[in-house]
């Protein structure tokens, strides 16, 4: 029998004397010992091997006095886990840029295989209309992947790819990366799995940008993070030339307020709503080839699930972890591919 698994599910087996008394044996997920998030809430992760999860085949048997009972054993299967839209990075499309050097110029994103409005895209990339190297497709093995590489057009822009959309504001020469997509979770994942290949370098004197405390000798790390959210709207992060002017006129604090950065590992929930779970992975050294990566999800709430129609999934990849601060090395490269949930 195929069973539906809505979360890290709890099941129970009931038995009783006919007409009298009830006994219940439970099969439930178990959680790692909790730790405290910097915002003050406890966070925890799912233990592998406990509970009932999506995409699994389970064996069961009844045991009495430490001995199996003949004829009371079998298997059951739960429904397959969900796919992440276009997570295999094999299908790419183009949509018109907000600022295009040539009439009709377009830039790429992973998605449907025909031109469409950005509003219909699941993945987006910031500032790609200025320089198309920030996110392009690359041929790797039997399919395609996303290739992220930073560039400077007056200020530094990191190679990036995220679930959401990007809006360009011409009057400010700035843009807003708006993070989050509506995604109907049917099962609670334990982790996000993907593959990556990376080149990382020291930040360098020219790449310091506006990051407080950054040093030229610091490694310009790549970063991938994921969030399960329950947001009323997307969270918007500003980047672009206006920030340089704000810093000169009002100081770094004003720049950061305008930028509105968000880091799920260190920050409290933003104004848009709750972060139910998050996971983060920093790429601190270059790789010699493809690396398999599993990013464990830390749950701030073990019972909640996103409400229908809310912005519920954030995945963000950047060739420079502090690209929001216009900080990074243009030599950094990041290839990403095969995004999928682990249950």
Task: Put a short name on every predicted segment.
Residues 16-53:
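Recognizes extended acidic, P/S/T-rich segments that occur
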Residues 1-8, 13:
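Single conserved hydrophobic/aromatic residue that forms the stacking wall/gate
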Residues 21, 93-149:
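Extracellular glycan-recognition surfaces and repeat-rich motifs
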Residues 63-67, 316-320:
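Beta-strand-rich extracellular modules
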Residues 233-307:
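Extracellular carbohydrate recognition and processing domains
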Residues 287-289, 305-308, 320-343:
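Extracellular carbohydrate recognition
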Residues 65-82:
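Extracellular fibronectin type III
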